From Swiss-Prot:
Entry-linked CDD domains: ALDH_C (cd23933)
Reactions performed catalytically: acetaldehyde + NAD(+) + CoA = acetyl-CoA + NADH + H(+)
Binding-site residues, NAD(+): S11, G12, N13, I14, S157, A158, G159, P160, G161, T162, R163, A164, N165, N276
Origin species: Rhodococcus erythropolis (strain PR4 / NBRC 100887)
Keywords: Aromatic hydrocarbons catabolism, NAD, Oxidoreductase
GO biological process: catabolic process
A GO term for molecular function: acetaldehyde dehydrogenase (acetylating) activity
Gene3D superfamilies: Dihydrodipicolinate Reductase, domain 2, NAD(P)-binding Rossmann-like Domain
Protein name as it appears in the record: Acetaldehyde dehydrogenase 1
Length: 300
């Protein structure tokens, strides 16, 4: 089967875990990994897997005679903002795993097929991939006046790139809660938990809804979205049934539904507790496969 050629830009934890997932793909063939640290473990592993590697950054990749069909970038927001127009000029489709938000944001259960022709798509954040689908599940049943998510992740799973992007995390995730999740207003909070042994990723999703909302329909919608996510992130699960509360002063006079989820990683390269990183790489792979299928069908 013909596959779309892929370059991974970045050689850190997320890029390395992504490499393992791409190796299993029926539609994507990882052929290059690009970094800036010649001693990075990611580049070493990629070389052992037969990929062409370079520590000379995006300049090296774009100087090659053969260009990839797709590039997955897991560097930092400011780096991707500079590289994105260069990818587009070279005719390379980009899947952005940073919070740069250069292109339209994609969350597979909500809008996977809406942006398959875009030159650049953004995977928002780990917290966004884990929680925005739940907000979307609620908002497709009733109006959501306000949605707030709290993403709690193991401190050990947050490398320098994640820490450098904390401000962008909250802004990009909050915007995604509104534009994709469907909430009128959204807010995102991230907690880096220093507990040892490290805790699994856990997320709380709070939605303000009308008092007369159909609770059974909301619960059913949430369960359907969870099943959709489990197709590419098997370790994604509800901790308990959605909890409904009557209007109160705290909720601004709205009734509320609160959902608790946890995300256990597949353990490809990252440990299972790093579900926050795993859901990013799994969602990016899912999006990349859809883009590749359409790209290859056009070429055929």
């Amino acid at each position: 089967m013909t596959k779309a050629s892929v370059a991974i830009v970045g050689s850190g934890n997320i890029s390395t875990d992504l490499l393992y997932k791409l190796q299993r793909s029926e539609w994507l063939e990882p052929r290059w990994m690009i970094g800036i640290d010649p001693e990075s473990e990611g580049l070493a592993r990629a070389r052992k897997m037969g990929l062409e590697t370079s520590a000379e950054g995006v300049d090296w990749l774009l100087s090659q005679a053969e260009k990839p069909d797709l590039v997955f970038e897991a560097t930092s927001a400011y780096v991707h903002r500079e590289a994105a127009p260069r990818y587009e000029a070279a005719g390379i489709r980009a899947i952005d795993l940073t919070p740069a938000a250069v292109g339209p944001a994609v969350v597979p259960p909500a809008n996977l097929r809406e942006h398959l022709d875009a030159p650049n798509v953004n995977m928002i954040t780990c917290g966004g991939q884990a929680t925005i689908p739940i907000v979307y599940a609620v908002s497709r049943v009733v109006d959501v006046a306000y949605a707030e998510i709290v993403a709690s992740v193991a401190s050990l799973s947050a490398g320098p790139g994640t820490r450098a992007n904390i401000d962008e995390f909250t802004k990009t995730t909050s915007r995604g809660i509104e534009t994709i999740g469907g909430a009128q207003r959204g807010k995102a909070i991230i907690i880096l938990n220093p507990a040892d042994p490290p805790m699994i990723m856990r997320d709380t999703i709070f939605c303000a809804i009308p008092e007369d909302a159909d609770q059974a329909a909301i619960t059913d919608s949430i369960h359907r979205v969870v099943k959709d996510i489990q197709q590419y992130v098997p370790g994604y699960r509800l901790l308990n049934e959605p909890q409904f509360d009557k209007p109160s002063v705290v909720s601004g006079g709205y009734a509320t539904v609160t959902t608790f989820v946890e995300v256990e990683g597949a353990g490809d390269f990252l440990p299972p507790y790093a579900g926050n990183l795993d859901i990013m790489t799994a969602a990016a792979t899912k999006v990349g496969e859809e883009i590749a299928q359409k790209l290859l069908s056009v070429k055929a």
